[in-house]
Curated annotation (Swiss-Prot):
[2Fe-2S] cluster binds at C109, C140, C200, R272. This is Biotin synthase. GO terms for biological process: biotin biosynthetic process. PROSITE patterns: RADICAL_SAM. Keywords: 2Fe-2S, 4Fe-4S, Biotin biosynthesis, Iron, Iron-sulfur, Metal-binding, S-adenosyl-L-methionine, Transferase.
Length: 336
């Protein structure tokens, strides 16, 4: 049955095409170089392929999460060495945001490890968002499941994007997470859209899912209506103490295929290389950029796991003739 997962929106953003799992799986089966080439053409039609959006991600409340996500070192259920830390104060967060901006970041993302915020937390978050927004940065928050009215409060404070990942396909989901359902995630995404916030929504590759399940994950994202403005693609970072610490290694070409398929199915979305980039070679990252990735997390840490060093990122971008995205270079001139 051809259905999209309708999310509320205050702006028209018609779904262009329905993507069945079989149709997405057929893309995965495309010969590797042909798939990358096709994705590169789609990318050029919608973005400047030499411009990379730089985002910084900061954990503003760390550890102690009651959820059982099998990949997450911040879960209180696993012995991973992550120490619980309460919500940071506004001044410390703003200082980090200033540093991020001085180093070229245009978006500042904030993550809090809890199932979802309480009303008192929202009051603190709105203060933080206003302070970061005043620096001239785009703001993004990943704060878990939202109750009614919370998304509107975040929007009013100046939040631009809300991140809430699907993580994986509906078929594979219960093998990874048991304390919140796939539909719970869709429900929060609906509240985010209804409030007029932009959506950042992606997932994690390499959690023992099959290629068909990867296709199901991409299909679920591509059939959100409207599609997410930002799609983070994470490669599993295996952390000792988590249930997925011994997950099977994923061949690098499969990750690049996933990036390419995301670009083809969601042509106007930012496709972000997120967690796991520290373990990627320069050559693999270059292939991801060729396949349509146009955003990275920039900084030496992603929440509680390592990230590629900034000096290495700057050098790689120089080698590939890439430049940080600005409002002036976001699109090729013929696409303006």
């Amino acid at each position: 049955m051809k259905t999209t997962l309708q999310l509320y929106s205050n702006t028209p953003h018609p779904q262009v095409e329905y993507w069945s799992v079989c149709k997405v799986e057929a893309l995965f089966e495309t010969p590797f170089l042909e798939l990358v080439h096709r994705a590169a053409l789609v990318h050029r039609e919608n973005f400047n392929p030499q411009a990379i959006q730089l985002s910084t991600l900061m954990s503003i409340k760390t550890g102690g999460c009651p959820e059982d996500c099998g990949y997450c070192p911040q879960s209180a259920r696993y012995q991973t060495g992550v120490q619980k830390q309460e919500l940071l104060n506004v001044e410390d967060i703003v200082e980090k945001a200033k540093i991020a901006k001085s180093r070229g970041a245009s978006r500042f993302c904030m993550g809090a490890a809890w199932r979802g915020p309480k009303p008192k937390d929202i009051a603190k978050m709105t203060e933080i968002i206003k302070a970061v927004k005043a620096l001239g940065l785009e703001t993004c928050g990943t704060f878990g499941l939202l109750d009614d009215g919370m998304a509107e409060d975040l929007k009013e404070a100046g939040l631009d994007y809300y991140n809430h990942n699907l993580d994986t396909s509906p078929e594979h989901y219960n093998k990874v997470i048991g304390t919140r359902g796939f539909d719970d995630r869709l429900n929060t995404l609906g509240k985010v859209r209804k409030a007029g916030l932009k959506v950042c929504c992606g997932g994690i590759i390499g959690m023992n899912e099959s290629r068909k399940e990867r296709a199901g994950f991409i299909a679920s994202l591509a059939n959100l209506d409207p599609q997410p403005e930002s799609v983070p693609i994470n490669q599993l970072v295996k952390v000792e103490g988590t249930p997925l610490s011994d997950a099977q290694e994923l061949d690098w070409t499969e990750f690049v295929r996933t990036v390419a398929v995301a670009r083809i199915t969601m042509p106007k979305s930012y496709v972000r290389l997120s967690a796991g980039r520290q373990g990627m070679s320069e050559e693999m990252q270059a292939m991801c950029f060729m396949a349509g990735a146009n955003s990275i997390f920039y900084g030496d840490k992603l929440l509680v796991t390592g990230n590629a060093e900034e000096d290495c990122d700057r050098l790689l971008m120089e080698k590939l003739d890439l430049e940080p995205e600005t409002t002036e270079n976001r699109y090729l001139s013929q696409n303006n």
